[in-house]
Curated annotation (Swiss-Prot):
ATP binds at residues 397-399, 421-426, 512, 528, 539. GO terms for biological process: acetyl-CoA biosynthetic process from acetate. Its cofactor is Mg(2+). The keyword Ubl conjugation does not apply. InterPro entries: Ac_CoA_lig (IPR011904), ACAS_N (IPR032387), AMP-bd_C (IPR025110), AMP-bd_C_sf (IPR045851), AMP-binding_CS (IPR020845), AMP-dep_synth/lig_dom (IPR000873), ANL_N_sf (IPR042099). It comes from Cupriavidus pinatubonensis (strain JMP 134 / LMG 1197) (Cupriavidus necator (strain JMP 134)). Acetylated. Deacetylation by the SIR2-homolog deacetylase activates the enzyme. Belongs to the ATP-dependent AMP-binding enzyme family. PROSITE patterns: AMP_BINDING. This is Acetyl-coenzyme A synthetase.
Amino acid sequence: MSAIESVMQEHRVFNPPESFVRQAAIPGMDAYRALCAEAERDYEGFWASRARDLLHWNKPFTKVLDESNAPFYKWFEDGELNASYNCLDRNLQNGNADKTAIVFEADDGTATRVSYRDLHAKVCRFANGLKALGIKKGDRVVIYMPMSVEGVVAMQACARLGATHSVVFGGFSAKSLQERLVDVGAVALITADEQMRGGKALPLKAIADDALALGGCEAVKNVIVYRRTGGKVNWVEGRDRWMEDVSAGQPDTCEAVPVSAEHPLFVLYTSGSTGKPKGVQHSTGGYLLWALMTMQWTFDIKPDDLFWCTADIGWVTGHTYIAYGPLAAGATQIIFEGVPTYPNAGRFWDMIARHKVSIFYTAPTAIRSLIKAAEADEKIHPKQYDLSSLRLLGTVGEPINPEAWMWYYKNIGNERCPIVDTFWQTETGGHMITPLPGATPLVPGSCTLPLPGIMAAIVDETGHDVPNGSGGILVVKRPWPAMIRTIWGDPERFKKSYFPEELGGKLYLAGDGSIRDKETGYFTIMGRIDDVLNVSGHRMGTMEIESALVANPIVAEAAVVGRPDDTTGEAICAFVVLKRARPSDAEAQQIATELRNWVAKEIGPIAKPKDIRFGDNLPKTRSGKIMRRLLRSLAKGEEITQDTSTLENPAILDQLKQAQ
């Protein structure tokens, strides 16, 4: 791939507040550089000393990194530990037993607090119940549940027994669930009767029944159902059991089974941009170490913080920064069942004010849709809420456009909270490139610098480094403890996907285009490599054009894809959501012309979208990710063949077929 041209310049810089630096885990850039130098000097020693200090090992490791079968790397492999013990038992031993582990807020606003002692007991009772059903170390259990304390209990109970969990997001269809049950070879499925979202009860057990009826799931002997709503469900005697009955009468202690550091803690399927889902397999030791280290470094977690990650446990963010990281750090966190727009789009700000949240971590797509709502209705604008408890903000899931970053910084953080714009992936296990809140000067739209120990670089299509200021392909040059171990059942696909021969088979391919600033070396993610457009020989990242569109005061959100064009090779197609009602006919044409001229002024005439399509919103998965493959099909006028079961709003597809 030739250098991606970066055509936007971002010059605003925001330094960490002095008061934050003074108390930070990593205070100032000298402290950051010292950690990076330590990792450069003695890479294995850097990781080993932290693994020994931060985790409880039943059997200490003597081997740090085994590269003999690269790229199937192993970390701490002769050591043994248990993830649930590290998250729960250690908190009982170090004085946190009565500390609140989870504040659960239901869809209807009811809040429940669960202490570390209570959580430990719930996990032990359920783990004992699973054991009584014959579930043991090495078995795979699929979890298809709503955001709930019980969802975390199910994950931790599997970890306690050494069973490998595979959480499937509660918005997936029966077919998607069945594919995952079959691929991972599940012996049990844990689900709920229904889930509550935005005041509506949505089926889960009924979808699980349909998935099992599709066949191939004969190994699933037990279906365990959490009674969330009390809604009517079909029941298969001998197979189906209520979660409360599985736990009933069980002792509230359960020995945590020690497993090898390399034992698969979980398999999490990514919807991979192509076809068959990929089961990303994560280890126990290396994964847990990084979950805890990044809680301390990126989120600067302190004993009195109230941490809120708005992700779902069905995604990796909900694994690392809900189910494992905060508990391993002994933190108090919020788990939220509902959606940001119910009962109105002030829900997030209201919850931050009521619970006095100090660290808030959410997705750019949520921020952008809430900007639109706030600007349309004064009553739910963040300025109506007391957000003074916040000290740190974060973003996750995709790059954040500079204008959305500025709105977040001013309106939510009141220009005093650092923003950690965290670049990472399902496959990386935890944060990779991110500002450190007490050290890194912030630049809107840039994820800044790799964490100490993460050897990120930008290369051309032959695997050679490109100079700062030239775009290229983001890679990681050395293995790190929390990295993906393999694709479940498909090691060849793992090698091809992440360690391609074209790059010499030794570099981890992130799949993102990126550029480093000439002076600061800061990384900016330009979008997925397959989101790079080639217009008349100019290569441009879609992210830049989207950022330019969103910088226009009338635009709430934009997504850009390419489509074949006889003249230019590829034409730019923009899907736009305005901060006002969707325009039509002559008005739509006029606004489309204005936006084309705006992009030409911001970036240059080469970046002008050929098609502009207006929708009430963009097609997104229920985790808020824009479904770009779907947009590519729409841009090309193709039939939609993708699985649209996770689509939040299917009706908008018709709107987006009309080009201006």
